[in-house]
Amino acid sequence: MDLGLDFGTTHTVVAYADRGNYPVVAFLDENDDTHDHFPTVVADDAGALVYGFTALEAARRGMPFARSFKRLLAQPRVTPDSVVHIGDRNVPLLEVLTGFFRALREALHTASSIESRLDETGGGPRTVLGVPAHANSTQRFLTLEACRRAGFEVVGMVNEPSAASFEFAHRQARSITSRRNLVIVYDLGGGTFDASLLKLEGTSHEVLDSFGVNRLGGDDFDEVLATAALRAAGRARDELAGESWAALLEECREAKEGLTPQSRRVTVEVPAAAGAGARVVTVAVDDFYDAATSLVEATTAAMEPLVRSLASPTDEGTELEGVAGIYIVGGASALPLVPRLLRARFGRRVHRSPMPSASTAVGLAIAADPSAGFSLRDRLSRGFGVFREREGGAAVSFDSVLDRSLVTSDVVAGPSSADHVVVTRRYQAAHNIGWFRFVEYSAVDDQGEPRGDLAPVADIVFPFDPELQRVHPLAEEDPAPGSVNLEGTPIIRREDGPLVEERYTVDPAGIIAVSLTDLTTGYRQEHVLHA
């Protein structure tokens, strides 16, 4: 079976390919009620980690829980050992991710609408996994690694807004013409925002550019509503302990998701705290929207580079030349404020997906379906470069290696060695030691220095001096970045350095690997780059 798996900040949605249709999987909760998602929640139930609906049931019994642990993946210095706080317990992030995907896979086999169709003896279902367009290498690696450890056969990883473009083309093919074959996917999820401009020619899709904000999503709207509820209750944020604050956020999330265009008031129960009892308060929806408008404006500011060259003012708003539509997807985009503000600016070209929370999962299922015939050329979406020592270690220079606009391989066609993008550089080393500090970044300034979101990827030490290479031989297996310890060894400039080759490979999932080779001695290091 071919699955599309949209790992969301608050909800995880799965769709599957079924003879040209792509239904969303329904999951059963503890009461055998059906839902079109699996909750992205973990709880500590008497020492055992539980996930999904079981975690929600444990949370209702007062057990400590954590929602939105996916957001930790967007932190600049995230590692497999980054900590998820579940009450007083600290659990490594990779352990939580793997446990979550394992619980999801078990639910698919035992408590879902497709349980009878999954072959338990045939290994994991063929799965295409979604990832935010601006996710760094570590986020991609950890998501992929956890999913594979849980037993899924991951055959591809597709950027979420690119996947939503497949769902748009599948559902609204008639809106795409030779004059209007551009689509802007506006993807506002629970924790991230991405906007991608795509050119659609039949089943061939190409990403022309993409921008986003790694930490902006539905969780932030929940905090705005929680702040308004506290104000209405006459309480202060510091009066609520961690678990009480988490309970209030959960209450606000449920209240927010129940809003309709006709809603005028929203009711929230503020938990007991600091000697005060629980209190039910009412917040005017207009007041909530006024406070949340700046969040929506932050998304339109982020996508401004996409629309600037296409925009022309009209009486009805901004007309976008050649654009068939701005397609609104993502669970947080269901808030009525979002399409209202976008339509006020862009007019009738704004189309909200009829299934905003499931659009990406459906698109991923289309990508997983070999018979669908879609192809995709995406962009790297974030720059990749290296800080190097110069002037005998007295200064540092920055070298951009991979531009954010780099066209990557066709991730839908399936991984093979031919699908990898390779960049090779050769030079004569000028020092006895090379210190490579690799980073990913969102932009560079006029001087070529990285700016905006900056995420360290790995520090690698490479001895250029043959004597140091003999003293520090590599292990047989691929060494971890930084495993060659030359701490305290002085950096010396030399005139007779070896010829060095740097070979960078970007796989279809967007994960970067580097091979460093001294072509004179044959000494080599190979690393898959992630923190």
What are these model-predicted stretches?
Residues M1, V155-Y186, A358-S375:
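Conserved phosphate-binding catalytic cores of ATP/NTP-utilizing and phosphoryl-transfer enzymes
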Residues H37-G47, L200-E243, V283-E304, V422-W435:
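Glycine-rich phosphate-binding loop plus the immediately following alpha-helix
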Residues R231-G234, P261-D378, T424, R494-L499:
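Helical "lid/coupling" subdomains associated with nucleotide-phosphate turnover
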Residues V84-E106, T110, G275-S309, L468, ...:
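Adenine-nucleotide phosphate-binding core of ATP-dependent small-molecule kinases
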Residues E115-P132, S312-G330, S515:
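Short glycine-rich phosphate-binding loop at a beta-alpha junction
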Residues M1-P23, Q172-L208, C252, R264, ...:
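Gly/Thr-rich phosphate-binding beta-strand-loop-beta motif of the actin/hexokinase/Hsp70
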Residues G20-E153, N159, E223-R265, E269, ...:
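Phosphate-binding loop and its immediate beta->loop->alpha context
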Residues V285, R377-A531:
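Acidic low-complexity intrinsically disordered segments
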